[in-house]
Amino acid sequence: MAEVKLLGFWYSPFSRRVEWALKIKGVKYEYIEEDRDNKSSLLLQSNPIHKKVPVLIHNGKRIVESMVILEYIDETFEGPSILPKDPYDRALARFWAKFLDDKVPAVVKTFLRKGEEQEKDKEEVCEMLKVLDNELKDKKFFVGDKFGFADIAANLVAFWLGVFEEASGVVLVTSEKFPNFCKWRGEYINCSQIKESLPPRDELLAFYRSRCQAAAASASAPK
């Protein structure tokens, strides 16, 4: 029987991407929680370049970067497909996944920075939300009729974004501004494939609230 291990952080949307893919495929795995402030030798040896989670270990082989891991899982294990079978739909799924992944830094920094830098990040995130709101009109999933690759990549904006907003007090998403996105987000969070695998929202909120407070304190400290 194949040995599958996943190194991750409980609060990380990137780790959750991999967990969801494994669950969709029905792959049994061992989850190993890492300590952000004291990373294990296994993590450092498995991802010596970036030293980050997630890391998938399959029969001793180490695979890193969440979207790379998703494709590996889809190609390696039997079970429901994560990427569409149709070449055009597969290309669309990869396009939206990359679009969403490229926006991660701006989304995160919006809630950790202040002043002009924050305003620039907010503008970029709002432009992204406009694009998504237009794309998601009358759609339940990004590509096709089932939850898949691009939807997994969207977990940061579907769930974590709302937590970031509440933790920081910076509100970007309203149903008036982005009605299609808000409708899609509500259905996403209640999707049976992921609902039971979301991290506890209250714990996630407390974690990111402390990070936002630490960032604010650092920004206001004398230089």
UniProtKB/Swiss-Prot annotation:
Expression sites by tissue: Root tip-specific expression.
Keyword Transferase: yes
Binding site for glutathione: 12, 39, 53, 65-66
Tagged with keyword Transferase: yes
GO cellular component: cytoplasm
PROSITE patterns: GST_CTER, GST_NTER
Single biological process term from Gene Ontology: auxin-activated signaling pathway
Keywords in alphabetical order: Auxin signaling pathway, Transferase
Entry's induction text: By auxin.
Pfam families documented for this protein: GST_C, GST_N
Documented EC number(s): 2.5.1.18
Record GO terms (molecular function): glutathione transferase activity
Catalyzed reaction equations: RX + glutathione = an S-substituted glutathione + a halide anion + H(+)
The protein's enzyme class: transferase
All residue ranges annotated as the GST N-terminal domain in the record: 2-81
High-level lineage: Eukaryota, Viridiplantae, Streptophyta, Embryophyta, Tracheophyta
Name this protein carries in UniProt: Probable glutathione S-transferase
Domain GST C-terminal: 86-218
UniProt superkingdom: Eukaryota
InterPro entries cross-referenced by the UniProt entry: Glutathione-S-Trfase_C-like (IPR010987), Glutathione-S-Trfase_C_sf (IPR036282), Glutathione_S-Trfase_N (IPR004045), GST_C (IPR004046), GST_C_Tau (IPR045074), Omega/Tau-like (IPR045073), Thioredoxin-like_sf (IPR036249)
The family this protein is said to belong to: Belongs to the GST superfamily. HSP26 family.
Stored Gene3D superfamilies: 1.20.1050.10, Glutaredoxin
